[in-house]
Regions:
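Catalytic loop of the DD-peptidase/beta-lactamase superfamily, centered on the K-T-G motif
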Residues: 1-102
Length: 102
């Protein structure tokens, strides 16, 4: 912020890495985990996402969504306000990666 680092790189690494042990999650949720305040993609293919593994994300009730994909050097923020249309985020993600040739 204003040229000053607020968080150490090590802190960001902890916050954006899975903090939940595999045995603590039901089987169907083994493709993603949880960092500190974010979801973490552990197996993007299994999640049917274009994002790279270890990308992190979160979404809201009205289809707001952000994700950070370090593997592809990409940050996406969607601030739509549409209730009840969960599949639109998947379509938007595919379009973003297709447009970028990823």
């Amino acid at each position: 912020f204003n040229g000053k680092r607020i968080l150490n790189p090590e802190t960001v690494e902890i916050m954006t890495s899975n903090q939940v042990e595999k045995k603590a999650k039901p089987y169907k949720f083994d493709a993603f985990g949880f960092g500190v305040t974010v979801g973490v993609a552990l197996n993007s293919k299994k999640m049917r996402m274009k994002r790279g593994d270890n990308s992190y994300f979160w979404g809201g009730a009205a289809r707001t969504l952000f994700w950070v994909d370090p593997e592809n050097d990409l940050v996406f923020v969607n601030m739509s306000q549409v209730l009840g249309s969960p599949r639109i985020n998947n379509k938007v993600e595919k379009l973003v990666y297709k447009a970028l040739g990823i």
